Amino acid sequence: MSPTSLNTSSETAPPSSTTVCVTGAAGFIGSWLVMRLLERGYTVRATVRDPGNMKKVKHLIELPKADTNLTLWKADMTVEGSFDEAIQGCEGVFHLATSMEFDSVDPENEVIKPTIDGMLNIIKSCVQAKTVKKFIFTTSGGTVNVEEHQKPVYDETDSSDMDFINSKKMTGWMYFVSKILAEKAGMEAAKENNIDFISIIPPLVVGPFIMPTFPPSLITALSPITGNEAHYSIIKQCQYVHLDDLCEGHIFLFEYPKAEGRYICSSHDATIYDIAKLITENWPEYHIPDEFEGIDKDIPVVSFSSKKMIGMGFIFKYTLEDMVRGAIDTCREKGMLPYSTKNNKGDEKEPILNSLENNYNIQDKELFPISEEKHINGQENALLSNTQDKELLPTSEEKRVNGLESALLSKIQDKEVLPTSGVKHAKGQENALLPDIANDHTDGRI
């Protein structure tokens, strides 16, 4: 599906004066959401950690209508008041940025507390603006189904088991906790200040993308192709949504007059064997395992119910095949995935992880297999579904387009950030929040 193809699940175009803020705007979800908002005629204020880093914002300023409807603002979730100017005059805020440090030695102070404080700081900016009517928080499936025993179906009334998370401390446990507590704190603060708070809960997000680096969620989704066995347990029993459907869901909920509370945005459920079959049938050039060690072929699916959104009139447009095709096509076009993992005899080539590391611009160690000792019941799917907006995989240096830098300078609104000589980092800003995994934070968001 072409990145410029418009899903029309929400029919009413916004008034030309509608201004919204998107945090974590450079990431996997954030950048696609910005694109769709611009297409709808919104005026978008996109917050990023470093507006002067052309490599990280070029895909935003090159979007259609960016020259008239998009401005970039320097903001840091850890700095109170950092979002004041960007949010001033906005009717809505889409909060996608989050703090993510899986290897943190002090998760309480490096992940959990910054995420909660960041949420409250942004809510304070909304209150100060006096114009914000809706606050949409992109959370994680990890707030719904992280528990010892999986149920067949989950909905918005379900909540992850904090005692289980704290006792097991599985991979990404601090991310789950941070999202759970930030959602609770945000809901309470928004209610106290008469701001409609909407929490949108996505599963594993898959599809084409415009960000310049490899989205972490696709590391998981495409693991049967790459042979990244550490991620097999994540998609053992997984839920999926197309990136475009998710972003249209954000806009739909913003435009829906009475939307408030939690909403699951998930369109498909599948086991790892379903995914393996889909890839084998459509891309026979890839070597896909017939069996996955330790995973029963008859394992049941676990579903996330989107009945609430569908009942409001939202329509999911994409199939599971559309999601995988969009992801594969984009990764191929960007040189991030080979066109085949078989040799002329039909046998498997050199392990693709080595090939990717050496030849396909994927340099970050986090792409490759991690220890399996902490994988519990496949719960990491909820985590990596939203590591949708972490800059894990830097690509090779891109050629700069003539005049691009000057175009950027004219579009950045923080006068302290960009004097004519270039980007002037405010004192202490270098330690700003990691740019939603997928996050804008870890998935490429800044």
Curated annotation (Swiss-Prot):
MF terms (GO), sorted A to Z: dihydrokaempferol 4-reductase activity; flavanone 4-reductase activity
One GO BP: anthocyanin-containing compound biosynthetic process
EC number, as in UniProt: 1.1.1.219, 1.1.1.234
Top-level enzyme category: oxidoreductase
Parts forming coiled coils: none
Gene3D superfamilies linked: NAD(P)-binding Rossmann-like Domain
Keywords tagged on the record: Flavonoid biosynthesis, NADP, Oxidoreductase
Binding, NADP(+): K56, Y175
Signal sequence, renumbered to the chain: none
Residue segments, region Disordered: 421-446
Keyword Acetylation among record annotations: no
Family: Belongs to the NAD(P)-dependent epimerase/dehydratase family. Dihydroflavonol-4-reductase subfamily.
Role summary: Bifunctional enzyme involved in flavonoid metabolism.
Name of the protein this chain belongs to: Dihydroflavonol 4-reductase
Species for this entry: Antirrhinum majus (Garden snapdragon)
Gene name linked to the record: DFRA
